[in-house]
Each structure stands twice: as C-alpha cells, then as structure tokens.
Amino acid sequence: MKVYIIDYHRDDPKKCTGRKLIKLNFAELTRYGKGIILDPYSKRILSILDKDIALKTGITIVDTSWNSTSKIEFEKIKGEHRRLPILFAGNPTNYGIAYKLSSIEAVIASLYILNEVEEAIKIANIIKWGHTFLELNKELLESYRNKSENEILEIEREVIEKIIGEP
C-alpha cells in the first residue's frame, strides 16, 4: 500500500517521523493529496471499507506540527478525507494523549485498521517506541481491524464513555 507524505516543514527535523518514512522508502513525498487523506478534522472515520481506495491510490499523511495546523489547511487538500478512531500516542512527546499521534503512528494505525498488520509491524520496527504504540493500543487496534465505519464509531463511542464515565 502506497503511503504519501505532504510535509509542511513545521516539525523539528530530528523528530519528524514523516521524513523518516520517506528516508527509509516507506513513503513518498508529495505536494498533493492522493487517495485517503488522513485528516483529524474529518467526520468520516477510516475503516476496512476504505481498503480498495487505499490499495488503488494510497494514503496521504499531512506531516505538520499539532501546534500549528488548522481545519482550513486540511479542507484545501483534495481526496477522500478520513480520521482515525481514538488511539493513544506512544511517542515520547505526546505519550498517552488520545488522538495526538505522530505521522508514523498514524501510518501504523491506518495499516492495522485496513488489515495490513504485517506492514504495520514492519513500520513500527523502524522507531524505538513503535512497539510501545502497538502495545498501548493493541486492544483498540484489534477491535477496529477489519470493521466497517459504523462498527468502529460504535466501539469508539463505548471507549470514550468508559473514559469520561458516562453510562
């Protein structure tokens, strides 16, 4: 499955996981959206139903700083916008924070959800904390894997209710 990176050059180059994916030939740099655009502001959620699109046209990650990105920037990118369901960062900067994943964590999660588990694990192996991310989210990733959008939304709703203590 092709992975593309749009790099806004707003991250510390030494910590930029998108550039690492490109450097190690796990992703290709692009200036335009291709296929599925991972967009944290999207109402639609990535699911197994998106696998055909991802296989044909790839997945695009927008590599930017969480502190300097906006919904408007994502809206300008053409493609099929999807967000990831609730997952927790395993990276040292945002460890344990829901939804605040690094680019490489977003790629790993996307591949896992689309049932490309071997490829997800292969990419997790290129960073020290890749397996931390997988272990931290193992139960969630397995529950999202191979599921439809509605099934994932229901699982996510249940997880959020447990976290905030709603009945």
Curated annotation (Swiss-Prot):
GO annotation terms (biological process): enzyme-directed rRNA pseudouridine synthesis
Pfam families named in the record: Fer4_RLI (PF04068), Ribo_biogen_C (PF04034)
Enzyme Commission number: 2.5.1.157
Binding site for S-adenosyl-L-methionine: T17, V62, L84, Y99, S103
MF terms in GO: 18S rRNA aminocarboxypropyltransferase activity; S-adenosyl-L-methionine binding
Record's subcellular location: Cytoplasm
Primary subcellular site in the record, as a coarse category: cytoplasm
Swiss-Prot/TrEMBL keywords: Cytoplasm, Ribosome biogenesis, rRNA processing, S-adenosyl-L-methionine, Transferase
Catalytic reaction annotation: an N(1)-methylpseudouridine in rRNA + S-adenosyl-L-methionine = N(1)-methyl-N(3)-[(3S)-3-amino-3-carboxypropyl]pseudouridine in rRNA + S-methyl-5'-thioadenosine + H(+)
Superkingdom of this protein's organism: Archaea
A cellular-component GO term for this protein: cytoplasm
Entry-linked PANTHER family: 18S RRNA AMINOCARBOXYPROPYLTRANSFERASE, RIBOSOME BIOGENESIS PROTEIN TSR3 HOMOLOG
Physiological role: Aminocarboxypropyltransferase that catalyzes the aminocarboxypropyl transfer on pseudouridine corresponding to position 914 in M.jannaschii 16S rRNA. It constitutes the last step in biosynthesis of the hypermodified N1-methyl-N3-(3-amino-3-carboxypropyl) pseudouridine (m1acp3-Psi).
Record family assignment: Belongs to the TDD superfamily. TSR3 family.
Name of this protein: 16S rRNA aminocarboxypropyltransferase
